[in-house]
A protein has these predicted regions:
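Long helical/loop segments within the catalytic core of UDP-sugar-dependent glycosyltransferases
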Residues: 76, 237-248
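Non-catalytic, topology-defining segments of multipass membrane proteins
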Residues: 1-77, 108-203, 262-347
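Juxtamembrane helix-capping/reentrant segments at transmembrane boundaries
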Residues: 93-113, 131-145, 227-241
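Transmembrane alpha-helical segments that form the membrane-embedded catalytic/substrate-channel core
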Residues: 76-85, 114, 118, 203-227
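Long, highly hydrophobic alpha-helical transmembrane signal-anchor segments
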Residues: 61-107
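Membrane-helix boundary/juxtamembrane motif in polytopic membrane proteins
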Residues: 172, 198-202, 225-235
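Histidine-centered catalytic micro-motifs
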Residues: 81-91, 118-130, 217-223, 244-260
Length: 347
């Protein structure tokens, strides 16, 4: 069996299967679309995240905790806030608009993000999934190796200003958030606790960036060529994974109905699974199903730069340093085969 590193297409349901399958439901039940209660699991994540951040600070300055434990508590604090800011930008963190925004800004501060940037850029992602020009997360996922995905989130800031996405006072909010970040770092340098900032904030933030990039951006949307709303993200069901990554293994449910809070993804999926089956929605991880899938994943782990034109890869200039013609041909073959060609939106 021969294997090639090519983006695999999701198999859509055949017309015969779609006609034969019972379609008793056209959308998710309304109960999942209602605003969350004032005290809900997302509020718990927000409070637990700040509690863990406080324990990390205490453990460094007072408790003398070992560094691995401090990195772990810092990582968990930021990991929880990743879900908080994500739900807040969809107004699904709290029913009251003020507290929803408060939680979003609070989560962003711990993560080193800007809440207006995250919100506007993420909504652009939802509007243009897998569009090479308009989806900012598409660039994050396809312009480098997975192990370097965290630094590519800075592209969101560039995208925010290039597209002039801010509204009303959001530019002021960005300035305050970034000013506060600079003040913290400068104060840390002057007062001698910069090692704490690097070890217990920046290092966990880097780890969380890889986690968010993998489970929020890369895995849900690979192989990055589907733009149909029923197939532009995937689901890989699992109870344990559901809690570890707080529902992002049901990412397609989130894209279809963004107002559903993370703790309802799983029951919402179970309610609409027959509909998703009819629509041909991908419901597997899609990495180990074939040799092509595995090779694509390994390519993305170590290199991950994908062109959108098979004859003009972003890595084509590497051919100049390859010593032999045979090696040049093999490299060009790989670069051409790894190109991503997104399908039309209604395909």
């Amino acid at each position: 069996m021969t294997c090639s590193v090519i983006p695999t297409l999701t198999e859509a349901a055949s017309p015969v299967a779609m006609a034969a399958a019972p379609d008793h439901r056209r959308s998710v039940p309304r109960r999942f679309l209602r605003p969350p209660k004032p005290w809900n699991p997302t509020v718990g994540l927000f409070l637990c995240g700040y509690l863990l951040a406080g324990l990390t600070i205490w453990g460094w300055f007072v408790g003398g905790w070992p560094l691995p434990l401090l990195v772990a508590t810092g990582f968990l604090a930021l990991h929880l806030q990743g879900t908080v800011i994500h739900d807040a930008c969809h107004r699904a963190a709290h029913p009251h608009r003020f507290w929803n925004a408060f939680m979003g800004h609070g989560a962003a501060m711990l993560l080193g993000f800007s809440y207006p940037v995250f919100t506007r850029v993420h909504l652009e992602h939802h509007a243009h999934v897998n569009d090479p020009e308009k989806d900012p997360d598409h660039t994050v996922s396809t312009f480098g190796p997975l192990w370097l995905i965290a630094p590519r989130f800075f592209y969101h800031e560039y995208f925010f200003f290039r597209r002039r996405l801010w509204r009303r006072y959001e530019l002021l909010e960005w300035g305050i958030a970034r000013g506060l970040f600079v003040v913290i770092v400068v104060t840390a340098a002057q007062q001698g606790f910069l090692p704490f900032v690097f070890n217990c904030w920046f290092a966990p933030a880097l780890l969380v960036g890889v986690t968010l990039g993998l489970f929020f951006d890369y895995l849900p949307h690979r192989p990055f060529n589907e733009r149909n709303r029923w197939r532009n993200a995937r689901i890989y069901p699992g109870k344990t994974m559901n809690w570890l990554i707080m529902g992002q293994n049901y990412h397609l449910v989130h894209h279809l109905w963004p107002s559903i809070p993370w703790f309802h993804y799983k029951p919402a999926y179970e309610a609409v699974k027959p509909l998703l089956d009819v629509k041909g929605s991908p419901q597997r991880l899609g990495i180990y199903e074939s040799c092509d899938d595995l090779l694509n994943f390994l390519y993305d782990v170590f290199l991950g730069i994908r062109s959108h034109r098979r004859s003009r890869s972003r890595l084509r200039n590497l051919v100049r340093i390859v010593p032999s013609r045979w090696a040049c041909r093999q490299l060009l073959h790989v670069l051409h085969r790894t190109a991503v060609t997104p399908l039309p939106r209604r395909s």
